[in-house]
């Protein structure tokens, strides 16, 4: 093995250890609920108890069926079922607001590039309606999509607003 001399102000007998003699040890980290080669179980499996009891018929014992439930943080309440809005945050309207900075060409280009399913005729109609009434509905989308459209239209310097769409049943 070849060792190199240290260039520091130490006695002449000190040498730097060769790179081969350095050993690295890998740390073994175990998960909280096991550490075997297989993955951990996240949810309880669906188990039919009647098959586990040797095939006995439990229907005459009036035992309610067991439903596998996961903890959703609601302390057992069914707040998800009580909601009247569809999943995804509900529908929102993307409104084009009237602004003296808007030009028809710029608004048409922005709307047709950002909002899918729009054409130049629809964009021109939105521009004319916003000039006449002060605002126009560009599209209706889920909240997350509507926020994305608003952010992208903002990059084109188009003033927009969002409002919940309560007209759909």
Curated annotation (Swiss-Prot):
UniProt keyword Chloroplast present: yes
Keyword terms of this UniProt record: Chloroplast, Plastid, Transit peptide
Region of interest: Disordered: 67-92
Family label: Belongs to the ClpS family.
Main location: plastid
Gene Ontology terms: biological process: proteolysis
Domain of life: Eukaryota
Presequence extent in this chain: 1-33
Compartment(s) where it occurs, according to its Swiss-Prot or TrEMBL record: Plastid, Chloroplast stroma
Organism: Chlamydomonas reinhardtii
Annotated protein name in UniProt: ATP-dependent Clp protease adapter protein CLPS2, chloroplastic
UniProt gene name: CLPS2
Role: Small adapter protein that modulate the activity of plastid Clp protease system (CLPC). Probably involved in substrate selection for plastid CLPC.
Gene Ontology CC terms, in alphabetical order: chloroplast stroma
């Amino acid at each position: 093995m070849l060792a190199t001399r240290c260039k520091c102000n130490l006695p002449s007998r000190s040498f730097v250890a060769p790179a081969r003699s350095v050993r690295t040890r890998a740390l073994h980290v175990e998960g909280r609920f096991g550490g075997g080669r297989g993955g951990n179980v996240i949810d309880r499996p669906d188990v039919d108890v009647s098959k586990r009891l040797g095939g006995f018929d439990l229907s005459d014992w009036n035992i309610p069926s067991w439903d596998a439930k996961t903890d959703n943080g609601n302390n057992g309440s069914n707040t998800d079922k009580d909601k009247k809005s569809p999943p995804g945050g509900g529908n929102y309207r993307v409104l084009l607001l009237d602004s003296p900075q808007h030009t028809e060409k710029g608004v048409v280009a922005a709307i047709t590039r950002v909002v899918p399913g729009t054409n130049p005729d629809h964009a021109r109609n939105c521009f004319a309606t916003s000039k006449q009434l002060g605002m126009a509905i560009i599209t209706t989308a889920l909240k997350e999509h509507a926020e994305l459209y608003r952010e992208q239209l903002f990059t084109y310097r188009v003033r927009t607003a969002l409002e919940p769409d309560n007209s759909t049943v």
